């Protein structure tokens, strides 16, 4: 890559420090044109790699900022290219002036994700590790961060490469035997291959099995609050997140749209979704909100059904209870500070789901709710072991394709098909797994993945 790129790598907001990153074969020429040491004698192009230097950035004869400059020579850098990082003052204008000076002196503005893309193209990391960079930045909880860091350090890469190494060995063996049948025999080989396919497919399926947990770790547990109008759903949301995010009134139907907030429970994120109260209505706007509530319930990992214990159950409650079928759900027996019109035992009997008495008004029952969520989703114990978690939808899709190809290999063996059939499907599995690492993907997909990154990353 001939161009030298630059971008601001820190947030564009006032802070103590801002970082401008430069990468490319002319990075040292660029910094030498604009940097002056305190005494004016140091030649920045001649300093050792991986060293930091105090000085100033100048635009011609105009002093721009007081800085620290980190010099890193290829190949031991993030991108694999000569790299310079300028630590300047973190004011928005100060950072922009330093960047403008860098661009005036030979660098080009980087595209979103271009530094990480160069790291991938220069062999510093595979595609799964490159994607993990963004996952680390976007991690919302302890386990998401740990999972992303493991992936960045190569956990997914190792698991996939181990499977691919076994497959390519047998692909090569079959091809060699077909080319030279006099010296390489395939007698009894299909049975040996069947055992290999069984073992490697078990590993593929094990990785796929982690994807549901991986998705929850990365994206949060989609937790939908359902109930009739004025049951206390918005009060519950405000109580869970610790602020008045939703409007709370005595007027039924106040919430008409979806409200989403994240909370962290024992290191795991819950995406709490407050919905419009379920009821039949002629109000067009409210009806749209109710329809959205029904849609969100279908997609939910967990439903919190808020019941106003001070009013009898009706047909709206019956509809909501139908929506709980086949779902993980907790019934919240709300407004326990008022005279009850229904008993918690009835709700337990009708739904089969656990019932927790709460009073959103008096802030009672929240600890019990958190414990119930932990018990329901994690068997009472949230732990993060050394298992590799698949958290990326692209990785999951590639594993599913590989799994299907291995099924075809097994079917061909069991039906006594010619050996070249084995080789074709083994190669398909091998290439689909390679997509995870970026070894079998097109330029368009690579560009699409990195276009989602932040500037300066």
Model-derived segments and their meaning:
Residues 1-146, 150, 154, 330:
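A glycine-rich (often HGG/GG-containing) alpha/beta subdomain
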Residues 2-8, 12, 142-264, 281-283, ...:
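C-terminal-of-GTPase-core extension/linker across diverse P-loop GTPases
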Residues 15-17, 50-52, 299-303, 326-329, ...:
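Short glycine-/polar-rich loops that comprise or flank the Walker A/P-loop
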Residues 53-65, 69-73, 253-281, 299-302:
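Switch I (G2) and immediately adjacent beta-strands of P-loop GTPase domains
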Residues 108, 269-271, 354:
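Conserved beta-strand segments of alpha/beta enzyme cores
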Residues 241, 276-277, 301, 308, ...:
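Short glycine-/small-residue-rich Rossmann-like dinucleotide-binding loops
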Residues 272, 306, 332:
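Generic enzyme active-site microenvironment
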Residues 286-310:
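Inter-motif core of Ras-like GTPase G domains
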């Amino acid at each position: 890559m001939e161009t030298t790129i630059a971008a601001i790598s820190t947030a564009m907001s006032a802070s103590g420090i801002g970082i401008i990153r430069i990468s490319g074969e002319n990075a040292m020429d660029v910094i030498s044109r604009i940097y002056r040491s305190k005494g004016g004698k140091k030649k920045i192009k001649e300093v050792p790699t991986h060293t930091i230097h105090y000085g100033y950035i100048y635009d011609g004869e105009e002093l721009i900022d007081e800085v620290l400059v980190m010099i890193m020579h290829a190949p031991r850098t993030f991108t694999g290219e000569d790299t310079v990082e300028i630590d300047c003052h973190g004011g928005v204008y100060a950072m922009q002036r330093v960047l403008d000076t860098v661009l005036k002196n030979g660098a080009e503005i980087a595209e979103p994700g271009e530094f990480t893309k160069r790291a991938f193209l220069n062999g510093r990391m595979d595609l799964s590790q490159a994607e993990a960079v963004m996952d680390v930045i976007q991690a919302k909880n302890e386990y998401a961060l740990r999972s992303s860091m493991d992936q960045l350090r190569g956990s997914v890469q190792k698991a996939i490469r181990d499977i691919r190494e076994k497959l390519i060995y047998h692909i090569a063996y079959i091809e060699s035997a077909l080319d030279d049948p006099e010296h390489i025999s395939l007698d009894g080989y299909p049975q040996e291959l069947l055992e290999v396919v069984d073992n490697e497919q078990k590993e593929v399926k094990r990785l796929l099995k982690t994807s549901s947990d991986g998705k929850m770790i990365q994206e949060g547990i989609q937790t939908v609050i359902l109930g009739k109008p004025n049951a206390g759903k918005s009060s519950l949301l405000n109580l869970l997140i610790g602020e008045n995010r939703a409007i709370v009134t005595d007027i039924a139907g106040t919430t008409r749209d979806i409200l989403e907030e994240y909370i962290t429970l024992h290191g795991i994120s819950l995406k709490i979704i407050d919905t419009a109260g379920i009821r039949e209505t002629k109000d067009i706007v409210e009806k749209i909100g109710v329809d959205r509530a029904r849609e969100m319930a279908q997609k939910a990992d967990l439903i919190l059904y808020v019941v106003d214990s001070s009013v009898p159950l009706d047909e709206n409650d019956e509809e909501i209870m139908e929506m709980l079928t086949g779902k993980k759900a907790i019934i919240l027996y709300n407004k326990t500070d008022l005279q009850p019109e229904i008993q918690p035992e009835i709700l337990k009997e009708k739904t089969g789901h656990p019932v927790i008495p709460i009073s959103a008004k008096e802030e009672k029952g929240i600890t019990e709710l958190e414990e119930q969520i932990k018990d329901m989703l994690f068997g009472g114990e949230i732990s993060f072991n050394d298992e590799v978690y698949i958290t990326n939808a692209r990785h999951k899709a590639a594993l599913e394709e590989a799994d299907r190809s291995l099924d075809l290999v097994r079917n061909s063996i069991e039906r006594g098909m010619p050996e070249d059939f084995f080789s074709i499907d083994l190669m398909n599995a091998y290439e689909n797994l390679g997509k995870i690492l970026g070894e079998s993907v097109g330029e368009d997909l690579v560009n699409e993945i990195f276009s989602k990154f932040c500037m300066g990353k």
